[in-house]
């Protein structure tokens, strides 16, 4: 299976060297007494920027000193992914960090969490509440079920990430442990905990997960994906 495009040391250095930011949106009443620096965006009576740059402007308010601060992070090293150029369906409420790759016609459902360095292949669906940890790889035309967890590996840096092949179905609330590889065409049953590599074209189930059968025509029919859900 393919290696991740960012290895653990590269991600660690990316986070360590990134400027830590507390991004805020501030709505205020009154007139700012000082000029707005280039690091802050002002649209009407709304300011966007890092708190360390915005806070001094609020101290200079004259007249009414009313303002509301909205923030969702503190000293964050990794911003959220800019999704505007992604050719995929991404539903509201999905949390996707920067340095994530998403293939064409993938589907990212609400409540899913995708960490830095993860890679999602074309046509793959990440269902509601699923978690892809750092550097996790999912191939093409696969399905990661609701609430499933693909464990992430950023530290220790020597550990291997989860790798999921093409045309794989991972059932709801399944857990795939760090370093495990799931072969293409396989099915992981709902609630399974996968602690060892899974070969291609088998069904695994249980805690810990074990092979219970090879993929047959009936299994393929029951686990077939719906292309219509991936239409943009």
From Swiss-Prot:
Catalyzed reactions per annotation: (S)-2,3,4,5-tetrahydrodipicolinate + acetyl-CoA + H2O = L-2-acetamido-6-oxoheptanedioate + CoA
EC assignment: 2.3.1.89
Coiled-coil features, chain-numbered ranges: none
Pathway: Amino-acid biosynthesis; L-lysine biosynthesis via DAP pathway; LL-2,6-diaminopimelate from (S)-tetrahydrodipicolinate (acetylase route): step 1/3
Domain of life: Bacteria
Gene Ontology molecular function: any one: tetrahydrodipicolinate N-acetyltransferase activity
SUPFAM superfamilies from the UniProt entry: Trimeric LpxA-like enzymes
Pfam families: DapH_N (PF08503), Hexapep (PF00132), Hexapep_2 (PF14602)
InterPro entries to which the protein is assigned, alphabetical: DapH (IPR019873), DapH_N (IPR013710), Hexapep (IPR001451), Hexapep_transf_CS (IPR018357), Trans_hexapeptide_repeat (IPR050179), Trimer_LpxA-like_sf (IPR011004)
Keywords noted in UniProt: Acyltransferase, Amino-acid biosynthesis, Diaminopimelate biosynthesis, Lysine biosynthesis, Repeat, Transferase
GO biological process, alphabetically ordered: diaminopimelate biosynthetic process; lysine biosynthetic process via diaminopimelate
Function text: Catalyzes the transfer of an acetyl group from acetyl-CoA to tetrahydrodipicolinate.
Name recorded for this polypeptide: 2,3,4,5-tetrahydropyridine-2,6-dicarboxylate N-acetyltransferase
């Amino acid at each position: 299976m393919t290696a991740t495009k960012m290895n653990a040391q590269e991600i660690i250095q990316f986070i360590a060297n990134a400027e830590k930011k507390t991004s805020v949106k501030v709505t205020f009443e009154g007139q700012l007494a000082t000029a707005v620096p280039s690091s802050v965006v002002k649209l009407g009576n709304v300011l966007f920027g890092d708190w360390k740059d915005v806070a001094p402007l609020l101290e200079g308010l004259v007249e009414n000193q009313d303002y509301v601060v909205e923030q969702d992070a503190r000293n964050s090293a990794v911003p959220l992914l800019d999704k505007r150029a992604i050719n995929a369906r991404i539903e509201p409420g999905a949390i996707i960090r920067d340095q994530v790759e998403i293939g064409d016609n993938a589907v990212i459902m609400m409540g899913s969490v995708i960490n830095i360095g993860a890679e999602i292949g074309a046509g793959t669906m990440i269902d509601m509440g699923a978690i892809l940890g750092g550097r996790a790889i999912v191939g093409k035309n696969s399905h990661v079920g609701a609430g499933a967890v693909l464990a992430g590996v950023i530290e220790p840096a020597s550990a291997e990430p989860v790798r999921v092949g093409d045309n794989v179905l991972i059932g709801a609330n399944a857990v795939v442990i760090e370093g495990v590889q799931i072969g293409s065409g396989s099915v992981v049953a709902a609630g399974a905990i996968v602690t060892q590599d899974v070969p291609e074209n088998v069904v695994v189930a249980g805690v810990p997960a074990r092979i219970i059968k090879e993929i047959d025509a009936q299994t393929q029919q029951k686990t077939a994906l719906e292309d219509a859900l991936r239409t943009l």
